[in-house]
């Protein structure tokens, strides 16, 4: 990548080498990858299923059914065997705990209000769920070993909603994208978590809010631990990226992204923190995080919905609203050019592969 004062490096993907994986379960709302890079999980909210994809063969390895309108999915960096999925019914929203090795739903945690996003602490002990209610918004904190629930109040005013929740690399702070009648904001929460994973006495608390003019669409955290990138969008101004110093709780730069003409929906950072992938209606726009200059576009699908990089930073996985997963090798990657072993772009056969079973251990009480 380029230095701030040097020429901007360009970014591009060889579309001829992209592998398409038909999931066959309608629009994909969210995607995550296991910390070992072996599995991808995608939520198919229209078909009440979650699909598990083997990243080695680029085929659907299994489908977990019976999950009502699954939306957000999060996996723990501490354990590749478990995933957390938000679901919604007319009566309640819930967090489903899934063993992705055995494909079993091992626990269900019913919650009040409407869930908007999920995040897992680095040690896997705490699960954070941003929620929206008729009168305000909050974050629910689940202890994954005891099932205890803590609620962090964000706002008690009607019309205030959460867009997303992110947790810092040390687990000590949460960052929540919040929208209200007067615009968006970034709420900063102290979690009272020590570096050894245990809790300091007292409760988690809101310690600050960075006000933004436009509705927040997504938040991503830089690798330095002190920077948050906030993507926002409005019908008149368009798409904007704000860079926030999380220590001082101030905006250090604002960049309008004229290259994005449609509505901005999601944002994800590359593993090295050098690039921001911004998803809009028909493309993924790639920005350099140092200068916020546009480096290029990813057009592997017509209507992208979510994406994630592989843990080693070699591959980009892009899901779309047609139920298709595109696998592309990143230009900076060091892996072989072929993104999948033994996969055919036109082969939509479901693989019967299952990994070796690991010993079962409880996640949530």
Where are these regions (language model features)?
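Predominantly soluble domains enriched in secretory-pathway, periplasmic, or organellar proteins
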Residues: 1-365
């Amino acid at each position: 990548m380029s230095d701030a004062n040097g020429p901007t490096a360009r970014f591009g993907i060889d579309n001829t080498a992209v592998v398409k994986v038909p999931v066959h379960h309608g629009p994909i709302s969210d995607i995550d990858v296991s910390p070992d890079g072996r599995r991808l999980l995608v939520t198919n909210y229209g078909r009440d299923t979650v699909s598990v994809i083997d990243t080695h063969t680029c085929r659907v390895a299994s489908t977990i059914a019976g999950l009502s309108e699954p939306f957000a999915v999060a996996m723990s960096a501490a354990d590749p065997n478990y995933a957390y999925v938000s679901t919604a019914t007319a009566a309640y929203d819930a967090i489903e705990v899934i063993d992705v090795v055995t494909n079993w739903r091992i626990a269900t945690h019913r919650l009040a209000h409407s869930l908007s996003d999920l995040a897992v602490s680095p040690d896997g002990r705490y699960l954070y769920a941003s929620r929206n209610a008729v009168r305000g918004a909050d974050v629910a904190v689940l202890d994954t070993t005891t099932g205890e629930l803590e609620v962090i109040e964000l706002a008690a005013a009607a019309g205030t909603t959460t867009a997303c929740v992110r947790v810092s690399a040390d687990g000590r702070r949460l960052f929540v994208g919040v929208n209200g009648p007067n615009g968006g904001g970034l709420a900063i929460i102290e979690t009272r978590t020590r570096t050894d994973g245990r809790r300091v006495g007292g409760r988690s608390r809101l310690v600050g809010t960075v006000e933004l003019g436009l509705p927040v669409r997504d938040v991503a955290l830089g690798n330095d631990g002190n920077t948050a990138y906030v993507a926002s969008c409005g019908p008149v101004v368009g798409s904007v990226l704000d860079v926030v110093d999380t220590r001082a709780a101030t905006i250090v730069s604002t960049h309008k992204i004229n290259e994005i003409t449609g509505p901005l929906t999601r944002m994800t950072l590359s593993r090295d923190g050098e690039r921001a992938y911004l998803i809009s209606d028909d493309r993924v726009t790639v920005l350099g995080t140092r200068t916020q200059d546009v480096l290029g576009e990813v057009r592997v699908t017509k209507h992208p919905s979510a994406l994630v990089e592989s843990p080693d930073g070699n591959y980009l996985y892009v899901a779309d609203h047609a139920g298709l997963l595109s696998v592309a090798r990143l230009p900076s990657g060091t892996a072989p050019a072929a993104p999948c072993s033994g996969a055919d772009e036109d082969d939509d056969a479901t693989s019967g592969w299952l990994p070796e079973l690991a010993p079962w251990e409880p996640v949530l009480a």
